[in-house]
Amino acid sequence: MIALRIYRALPPPVRRRLVNLLPAHRRLGVVRTLSGPRGGGTVHPLGARVAVPDGGVRTRAEVVATATPLEVWHRNLTAVTTALESAGIDYHCLRNDDFLRSSVAVLDDHRAAVSRLVRSAPALEGAHVRVVEVLPGRDQPEAAPAEVFQIWFPMTDARAGVVLGAQFACEVEFWTRHDDVVRAPRHNAVIDEAPVGAEPVRVAAALLSHFVPEADDHRYRTRRDLTVRAPDRVGFPIDAVYTWVDGSDPEWLKRKMAALGTPDGPLHAIAANTSRYHNRDELRYSMRSLHSFAPWLRRIFLITDSQLPSWLDPTHPMVTVVSHAELFADLGGQSSFNSHAIEARLHRIDGLAEHFLYLNDDVFLGRPLLPTHFFHANGIAKFFLSPAQFGLGEAKPTDAPVKAAGKNNRRHIQRQFGVTITQKMKHTPFALRRSIMRQIEVTLQADVTATAQHRFRHYGDLSIPSSLHQYWAYLTAQAVPGDIEYEYADLGHPSTPARLTELLARRHRDVFCLNDTDSDPNTFQEQESMLADFLPRYLPFPAPFELPDDVIAERRKLGATDLWRQARGADRRGRQLDAPTTPALRVGRHADSAVVHKPRVGPRLDAPTLPSGRIASGRHAAHQTEDPRPGPDLPPR
């Protein structure tokens, strides 16, 4: 304990010098012990209320089994509107300038009634309420700061590591009457003042926050004159694509060894090293991060070499699994061990949206994000330049594959556009468009086809979705540079445990990447322990496409190829072989690509109560509050 305190008190440069005195294979373990996550060891029962810091205050949060920011957003807004309706207080919902919060406007005449209501309404039992001052709008410089009631139900996981609280509060603001108009106390995205007595209507929740997906079928009451669609709202579907491999699968290893016996050119040491294919369940948590922090995604496509993760329910409507045999059907349908080759075919996925995010399984969303973090509302994509460079000169067999591909990209950009590129892209989700990838394939057909045919990384490859697409799109006015809060950590580096500890404590990054390109196999066990500790703490709530733990434990006894084979057999029979252990598989060609599946969205609550221990969620119940003065429904715009 004394050594731990001394180490943590030392300046970082001194820590690094001490660590470098250790043998290389021991550094990661020692640093992890000295700087790993502190606290959080107590596991609280579901339904318990535990003290947590939240929004600058200390409050008590309910321990729940699963929750997402979108579900909590709905929970808070539903409870407030239910309480107001039960008390007969007129209101309207409107878009908050903070996309993670909701707003409800009430006439100032009802301020005293609302003040009493928040202390007594059954719908708000257990809610945290605070009154804050907000600044008036720019066109009201003479106005005094206004009071806003923030109302939320704090929730946390069993370790109290994640708090879903004040950040997602519903804010009640008080509008003042001036003759025949009502005036907002602060800025909002639509209107500063409006006529008295506007027609009440119910609208899709998507009109109230850009975080809410178009497919969300919750409806809330507002004024007809507030039912406008903002020009900066993304209205087109966005999908996500992953490539994944389980390098420990015996049958996959046989396929890899057979392919290594017939190489298609000089093979760089990194091109087939073990760490490139090592599976630590990162995909499970990366997909969790999408479910939690990007509910606006339409569907997730998972490309595998006829493998299935043991934890994935491939029958879930949000997930479509695509095999290499399908992706490379016109090239013989063989397994590929080359990420550049697989990436060169992404635009050929049946049913994929024009706009999509491509992620490696070591990339995670770190907090709630909007579609506009990746695409402008007019469809233009964003890309995120890295300060790292891939060097000058032509690609050589001795170049690391990523550098060789960057040099090949540069050669084509020079020929097509007359400019020279030198920078890599950050390891973030890549915002891509199918039409641009098709254009690249048509223009550079020979090189794209050659890349797709290389079964291992080759110095002649192109890296299309991670570099070439971005520059090509930029130089054809279809993409622009963007900004993103980002963290990159090499799993084998001694500084990584301390950086993960900071990520857990601050949760201050939009995206983080936990990369492992060329680690010593002797450190794999330590890295696995580090991730097994970090990822469940950062993303503790399972997604709906994950199977129950007891089912996963049984499925882990089989290899990833065996799981695929069982599920594929179930798919051909039109039934499950041994449900729920072997769920029927939804694969690319068998999935109905014309159907747009609604994502699993917010809590379907019969307010005012919340089932203890879990937020109810799914498509089976609707927002059921009754409007005392019902108006017509408006469809999403």
What are these regions (language model features)?
Residues 308, 313, 345-390:
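GT-A fold catalytic core of metal-dependent nucleotide-sugar glycosyltransferases
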Residues 1-31, 362:
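Boundary detector for helix-to-coil junctions that initiate low-complexity/charged tails
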Residues 59, 67, 71-223, 227-232:
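Long, charge-dense tracts
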Residues 375, 381-456, 460:
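Long, charge-rich alpha-helical interaction segments
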Residues 85-87, 110-158, 464-466, 470-575:
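Long, low-complexity C-terminal extensions of enzymes
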Residues 31-110, 206-326, 477, 514-520, ...:
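N-terminal anchoring/stem segment of glycosyltransferases
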Residues 308-352:
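Active-site-proximal specificity loops/subdomain of glycosyltransferases
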Residues 576-594, 599-636:
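Compositionally biased, low-complexity flexible segments
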